[in-house]
């Protein structure tokens, strides 16, 4: 009788990928990157082990939103003080904090717990085209579709 393969955390080989966000739709990019971070693109995927790869996203300031979401989509945060609910439109967030916009979308698609926090540390997002991870020799990842 055969048993199901279970990956061990210390046996996982991790790659580095570069994804160019220029002209990409926010949600479609985020779902594919979340899948790579979890390791779902590997045959050795194990749900309770971090088997994913590192992802570097460049040109976050050039991400695309469909429809009228730039003006209609709101991002909320709270200061933890009474009456401290703050809100920003997607246009303001993309203009002033483009990295935060992508990180929020991707982290929302990851598990909520210890594994999700561990997986999200492998995400590196940069507003421009430059990144400081050349020493890791990242591969260019072509998105589907």
Curated annotation (Swiss-Prot):
Pfam families with a match to the protein in the record: Ribosomal_L13
Q: Which UniProt keywords apply?
A: Ribonucleoprotein, Ribosomal protein
Can you state the subunit structure given in the record?
Part of the 50S ribosomal subunit.
One GO biological process term: translation
Q: What is the organism field in this record?
A: Bacillus cereus (strain ZK / E33L)
Of the GO CC terms on this record, one is:
cytosolic large ribosomal subunit
User: Which PANTHER family does UniProt cross-reference here?
Assistant: LARGE RIBOSOMAL SUBUNIT PROTEIN UL13M (PTHR11545:SF2), RIBOSOMAL PROTEIN L13 (PTHR11545)
What family does this belong to?
Belongs to the universal ribosomal protein uL13 family.
Provide the protein name: Large ribosomal subunit protein uL13
Source superkingdom = Bacteria
The record's InterPro entries line, in alphabetical order, gives: Ribosomal_uL13, Ribosomal_uL13_bac-type, Ribosomal_uL13_CS, Ribosomal_uL13_sf
One of the record's GO molecular function terms: mRNA binding
Keyword Ribonucleoprotein included in the entry's annotation: yes
What PROSITE patterns does this protein map onto? RIBOSOMAL_L13 (PS00783)
HAMAP family, alphabetically?
Answer: Ribosomal_uL13
Describe the task this protein carries out: This protein is one of the early assembly proteins of the 50S ribosomal subunit, although it is not seen to bind rRNA by itself. It is important during the early stages of 50S assembly.
């Amino acid at each position: 009788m055969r048993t199901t393969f279970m990956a061990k955390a210390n046996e996982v080989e991790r790659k580095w990928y570069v994804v160019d966000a220029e002209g990409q739709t926010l949600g479609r990019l985020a779902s594919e990157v979340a899948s790579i971070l979890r390791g779902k693109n590997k045959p050795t995927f194990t749900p309770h082990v971090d088997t994913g790869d590192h992802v570097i996203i460049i040109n976050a300031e050039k991400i695309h939103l469909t429809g009228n979401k730039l003006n209609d989509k709101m991002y909320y945060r709270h200061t933890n003080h009474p009456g401290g609910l703050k809100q920003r439109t997607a246009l303001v967030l993309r203009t002033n904090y483009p990295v935060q916009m992508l990180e929020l979308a991707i982290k929302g698609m990851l598990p909520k717990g210890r594994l999700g926090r561990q997986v999200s540390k492998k995400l590196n997002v940069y507003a421009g085209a430059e990144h400081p991870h050349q020493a890791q020799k990242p591969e260019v990842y072509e998105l589907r579709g």
